[in-house]
Amino acid sequence: MNTMKRMDCRDLNQSELTQHCAELGLPKFRGRQVFQWVQQKAVQNWEELRNIGAGDRQKLQEGLFLQPLRKVREQIAQDGTRKFLFRCADGETLECVLMDYDRRKNRDRHTVCVSTQIGCAVGCAFCATGLGGWRRNLSPGEILGQVLDITYLMRQEDPDFQVTNIVFMGMGEPLLNYEAVLKAIELLNDPEGQGIGMRRMTISTSGVAPKIRQLAKDNPQVGLAVSLHSAHNTTRDQLIPMNRKYPLEELMEACGDYTTLTNRRITFEIALISGQATLEAAQAVGHLLKGQLAHVNLIPVNPVAGTGMARPTAKEVQQFAQSLESMGIPVSVREEKGTDIDAACGQLRRQLECEQK
């Protein structure tokens, strides 16, 4: 009688799958085959593993489960951005977004913004995700499953579709689900899976200083983006409650340690809000980042019901950027995607929850 705990095959790397197959009485090479089917081809059920006999598939099904996320809703913006609401096995819902960037001379870039938690405990003032509180962490399989299931869906339209970039900027704080995020990165990077280069993945954090240091020591070759939003503790306390635990002084010290250990530039994100995108605010950011290995990404805020925040004018955005550039700070304004479908994280999930009340 098999008393092994049934595991999610999407959580397992090749070595773990090989070991698990051996424990199920299967040849070890089955581990590699299963990994390729699950992680590279993004299969949705065991019957799709065509080079594995029915008897072995039955053993796999008894010892492992393969349970894709179920699409609940999809919204498609005029610019082609797609927002997905998926349901997990326990009934919880999560969001992820597919953004296409046509680079013409190079290959097209297909970026997926993935969630790492159900809800979020950080409670940033301009974010819809935190309005419903934190429910639980996502497993590695649920994190990378967003990429796999989008890939599966898109290959119904284009058999050659391939995700090229990942940003951990969806629902949740990635560094508060640290081990699962790193495992998902490992699996997504495997050349026999999706084969996405680590330099094409970016983790965005609200400022969990100790985990920024740990990330520097563990040194996966991923990008780091820090949600800065203000150079004043009093303002940042209101925008990002995490700042009360890890204030700017501690955050910037951790960022300095990160760049020293990795020699990699950090992207500092500034959400621009009408009435707060002032020249004084820009100059304060410039002084804070002076001498840092840094790039600033300006993000005109998406209006979210329940936050009372509005977008700044184009002139405010331009003046903010020019002020930073005059201080020698590299700056860009985020290319807007999906504004007509509320593509900011948490909005579609919140809409569904409001409808069900």
Curated annotation (Swiss-Prot):
Enzyme Commission number = 2.1.1.192
Where's the active site on this chain?
E95, C345
Q: Name one GO molecular function term.
A: tRNA binding
Q: Which UniProt keywords apply?
A: 4Fe-4S, Cytoplasm, Disulfide bond, Iron, Iron-sulfur, Metal-binding, Methyltransferase, rRNA processing, S-adenosyl-L-methionine, Transferase, tRNA processing
State its cofactor: [4Fe-4S] cluster
List cystine links.
C113-C345
**Which residues participate in S-adenosyl-L-methionine binding?**
G172, E173, S204, S227, L228, H229, N302
Residues reported to bind [4Fe-4S] cluster: C120, C124, C127
Catalytic function, reaction form: adenosine(2503) in 23S rRNA + 2 reduced [2Fe-2S]-[ferredoxin] + 2 S-adenosyl-L-methionine = 2-methyladenosine(2503) in 23S rRNA + 5'-deoxyadenosine + L-methionine + 2 oxidized [2Fe-2S]-[ferredoxin] + S-adenosyl-L-homocysteine; adenosine(37) in tRNA + 2 reduced [2Fe-2S]-[ferredoxin] + 2 S-adenosyl-L-methionine = 2-methyladenosine(37) in tRNA + 5'-deoxyadenosine + L-methionine + 2 oxidized [2Fe-2S]-[ferredoxin] + S-adenosyl-L-homocysteine
Per its UniProt record, what Gene3D superfamilies does this chain match?
Answer: 1.10.150.530, Aldolase class I (3.20.20.70)
According to its UniProt entry, one GO biological process term is: tRNA methylation
By sequence similarity, the record places it as follows:
Belongs to the radical SAM superfamily. RlmN family.
HAMAP family with a match to the protein in the record: RNA_methyltr_RlmN (MF_01849)
PANTHER family in the record, alphabetically? 23S RRNA METHYLTRANSFERASE, RADICAL SAM CORE DOMAIN-CONTAINING PROTEIN
- Any additional notes? Reaction proceeds by a ping-pong mechanism involving intermediate methylation of a conserved cysteine residue.
The protein in question is named Probable dual-specificity RNA methyltransferase RlmN
Q: Which gene encodes it?
A: rlmN
